[in-house]
């Protein structure tokens, strides 16, 4: 069976502990990627990646590796776009999936909001992380793992 790997854009990710538990339950490997040092549990399925300095070093590291049997967890919309184009499943920490159908509009709205904030016409950012977001994320991650496993099994037999 093809191995599924989870790539976690770890800087400011509020669901890392949940990712570790789901990965252990499903026997899925996890790459926790950050620009610098980040603490991760000592577990054979979990690896820490310090992608190095640079504003997009962690994003580039993930985008260069993510593929069809991988799941990327990120709130970074440009990174999500790159990974969706590479065929990876992408889930935001609030459980929202980024798909081929949704990523174009999501990226356009993100760019518009960035421009509005830069011009001073709008302030603020996304709403705060809620307990229901954690639940939605866990459900979305379980579904993505099961979907990829079914697709791999169908291709093999």
Swiss-Prot record:
Pfam families: DUF188
Family of the protein in this entry: Belongs to the UPF0178 family.
NCBIfam families: PRK00124.1 (NF001095)
HAMAP family linked to this entry: UPF0178
Name assigned to this protein: UPF0178 protein Nwi_2152
